[in-house]
Amino acid sequence: FSDGMLFTAVWEREGKMAGTPKEEIKRIADQFAFTGELVSCGPCGSGHINETYMLRYRIGEMGSIKVILQKINREIFQKPEELMENIAGVTGHLKKKVLQKGGDPEREVLNLIPTKDGKAFLTDENGECWRAYIFITDAVSYDLAEKPEDFYESAVAFGKFQEMLADYPAETLHETIKDFHDTKKRFQTLKNAIEKD
């Protein structure tokens, strides 16, 4: 298959990708500041909250870039503008920290792709919200730990994340899911569910 044929073949085989028709994905993608020509698209990942798509754009004769396009679940995130304000603020802060330490913010931090009018996300005519990130190539993620070392590496990464955010102005963050970080309340909810089961 050529890239164009692959793009068409995937859509014809699947008909719909994770619930959103192909024409809609193309139309939404066209509203972001992506570089290049869209040549392929398909569902991405194993998540259960947002609709996630992997898009590949051809840049020039030989190069290409992959991006992630996500439709934010409005049932879970009822104030997506606050969610995206949090993400933009935190990722901006992390990029500065990574640069200060001589790291590579393109690989170590999520990079939002703005809409063509410079916003962090898009609200379509149906009130659905979409965001886009540069895909980090050669990165690995796990749904389940495969060995004890995976737990260790997860803890190291989480510790590094917390360290870099130690001086972030937490008072500027919005609570995007009520009581999500209330450990006592979450634990009580778990206990109640266990008792009912």
What is the meaning of each model-derived region?
Residues 41-43, 48-58, 64-195:
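Conserved ATP-binding subdomain of kinase catalytic cores across diverse folds
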